Amino acid sequence: EWSLDEQVTMIAQAGFDGIDISAQHPDESRAARHLMRDAGLSCTCYAFPDSVSGFQRDVDLALELEAQHLNLIIQIFPVSVSEGVDVIGRLLEIGRQSGLPLTVETHRNCITTDLLYTLQLMEGLPDMAISADISHYVVEREFTWPVPERDEAWMQQILARAVAFQGRVASREQIQIQLDFPQHQGWVSKHLQWWEDGMRHWRAREPADTKLNFLTQLGPPPYAITGRDGYELSDRWQESITIMNWVREIWQRLEKNSKPEQR
């Protein structure tokens, strides 16, 4: 197990620009942020708000940590769309009043668990900024292969609204699959296409001086699949570097192919 200091050093030396840290563990996050400043790394934060009344604490910590934005995995579970719109609207208003950009992540076991419900939330909240972790919907909807046109159209709506992205590759039954296994290459290619589509939407919409955050998010077990011996079947650290390089290649290709007036 690497120490916090070792982790920050490795991340900086590998060429990453920043780290996403938790608003749930203030002391650990403050310690990490101190090391990140010394290493020249920027910061985003994530939180799991389970009430509107307690959300200001998450916002205050993210501001203290100088987070570029606070990403929300909202642990409030309304049944109706109108209730969901009300809850998220109140959270977004707290962010606005505090001057902190907020994103709402597409994630299972939270308010955006269901793809179709999330699309309705987006319609009711035109100013809701999406952080797109599309792997969750691949599993949640159990997309068949090849992905049907109907499901592709739904996914494109998510990508068109995304202001940030999170990178792991899923299959219809597994949330995080190994990147170099031959049997996974169809899903790898599909996620690369989705990320490129999302970044193309973003570039067409956002001002030229806006920063796009792409988080290489590869979770430990049980996200990571393990063998009988309990050890993971791939090296998540090396896979995170692989995803970083893929995303930068996509960005450079989009940059090269864009017209000067577009950016």
Task: Tell me the role of every PLM-derived stretch.
Residues 122, 181-200, 222-241:
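Short, electropositive alpha-helical surface patch
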Residues 1, 22-24, 46-50, 75-77, ...:
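Active-site beta-loop-alpha junctions enriched in small/polar residues
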